[in-house]
Amino acid sequence: MLNQLQRDILRLKKEKNAIILAHNYQSREIQEIADFKGDSLELCIEASRIEGKDIVVFCGVDFMAETAYILNPDKKILIPDRGAECPMAHMLSAEDVRMARKRYPDAAVVLYVNTLAEAKAEADILCTSANAVRVVESLDEDLVLFGPDRNLAWYVQEHTDKTIIPIPEEGHCYVHKMFTAGDVMAAKEKYPEAELLIHPECDPEVQELADHILSTGGMLRRVLESDAESFIIGTEVDMTTRISLESDKKTIPLLEEAICENMKLHTLEKVKNSLINEEFVVTVPDEIARRARRAVERMIRVSE
């Protein structure tokens, strides 16, 4: 049963001819009013297919809303709280990428979508945690500059013969850095029958203990397709909420404290105000958007 605030949002969404996109880490009440929920890759693909809407309300962090604009420069892209920034996306600047290219002129540059538009514009192609290995394998170059998440870079290196150089050396997601091998061992001892699903932004010693290393979208598919009845979820805590909307199987957060405070800045009240006032508008300068779009679209072609 939707509450009054949720019903108000659905009414406003119809009046404004808007669509609401939400990342899997959003709260239950926001996931319940979203037109589409997904991981970074799924949201990129969905954003590239939007037709017949004037406004896109993006319940995610800054780089996600920027990507929606890059793919839809003719639409008004709104983010309910403009303070919703991804710390990892701010760990790699466009200048950092240019300097790395000068140092390794024969390398391809693969950037995680978790980067700001200015950095994306310097990339040859983008990737997400769902398609990173496939993207790297699609390249002719044997040397790949990969950033900004060093743990995802490690994961890719484990699954390719190419040489992966992380840029910067210590880029990371603060939420996934919370998980330790000790947390995993304790959870497996407490829930021995549960499958352990781990995100590739986790540290290598955590990944090595996983039953499956998956993006959040991959985690949802695994739960739906597996014969197992319980799962330990090694990513942001509200991924268990996302799964619960699709499945009655038992999901246990690896850490209850694994909360992305940046994602949680969005609330129903802010979504409502975003629609009423058409705020906060997200744009990207034309030349940066053009160059970044090329890298985004190349990724989407590899993924489809």
Curated annotation (Swiss-Prot):
Pathways per UniProt: Cofactor biosynthesis; NAD(+) biosynthesis; quinolinate from iminoaspartate: step 1/1
Matches recorded under Gene3D superfamilies: NadA-like
Transmembrane annotation, as ranges: none
UniProt binding sites for [4Fe-4S] cluster: 86, 173, 260
EC number per UniProt: 2.5.1.72
Signal peptide: none
Keywords: 4Fe-4S, Cytoplasm, Iron, Iron-sulfur, Metal-binding, Pyridine nucleotide biosynthesis, Transferase
Record-linked InterPro entries: NadA, NadA_sf, Quinolinate_synth_type2
Catalytic activity annotation: iminosuccinate + dihydroxyacetone phosphate = quinolinate + phosphate + 2 H2O + H(+)
Intracellular or extracellular location(s): Cytoplasm
Superkingdom in the source lineage: Archaea
Gene Ontology molecular-function annotations: 4 iron, 4 sulfur cluster binding; metal ion binding; quinolinate synthetase A activity
Stated name of the protein: Quinolinate synthase
Source organism of the structure: Methanothermobacter thermautotrophicus (strain ATCC 29096 / DSM 1053 / JCM 10044 / NBRC 100330 / Delta H) (Methanobacterium thermoautotrophicum)
Phylogenetic placement of the source organism: Archaea, Methanobacteriati, Methanobacteriota, Methanomada group, Methanobacteria
Gene it is expressed from: nadA
